[in-house]
Amino acid sequence: IARADSYDGPLADVLQSQFEHFRPHVPVAGKRVLLKPNLVEYHKAKVINTDPRFVGAVIELFKREGAAEIVVAEGPGHWRNVQFLVNESGLGDVLRAHGVRFVDLNHDEPVKTLNLGRMTGLDHLYLSQTVLSADVFVSLPKLKTHHWAGATLSLKNLFGTLPGICYGWPKNELHWRGIPHSIVDIALTHTPHLAVVDGIVGMEGDGPLNGTAKPVGAVVMGADLVAVDATCCRLMKLPPERLPTLAMAAMKRLGRIREAEIPQLGEPVAALATAFEWPPKVEKQLLTAEQAATAS
């Protein structure tokens, strides 16, 4: 965890200091790097998406690290006119300034891939060729609550990697199969190498679209996405053990959820933790304390 109070500060320097700990495990020099931000909808007064300045700082980081190519890609679940969304959100300006191309994953070439999770009952998943062909795959979510999942972080962000031409808008079949089940299947089938969470300003309340801005001043980076998301929940003072996605992911050995088992560097959670307002009626979507204890 690193402290970053503003998007206008030296974010690339902050990220580079964090990445020192991950360079041996996630080498990017000479590699093709795919960045997957959270780009859902654009509303001028809301903090729905990974901030374009944050994406720009991550691009700068990997340029410094010697990446051969950097691609930003997303398959939004709501808007079909993705290029309009990219431009209106401000992401287009950032990508043009850095000379980085954007790929609409909703219309990317689907690749039939053996489902390694099998939580949904699906034998195969159709993944994006652009995602599968990347040497380094990075999830760049926004720190947000979610009215169905409890929180939407680096794992939930993977919904946008599956082509809409196969799964519909908003990835209907995956919702019918169960959001936690689908997330875990996707993550086990093609696991990102790194997560970098935009927690400078998050969203609390009725996320992922209708919540309110919540300044936190944190950037969270990690190679274990379950640990990253559990840590982000603790920053939001949400109980990660009660989120079905994280409980299920830990059960499937995708990563670590217990705080005592997560090697934590940088700022301590307590230094930046701030209570987020929960989404209305989200209790119905969470595990009870008893269920969480049994699952763990």
Regions found by a protein language model. Name each.
Residues 1-296:
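N-terminal and secondary-structure boundary signal
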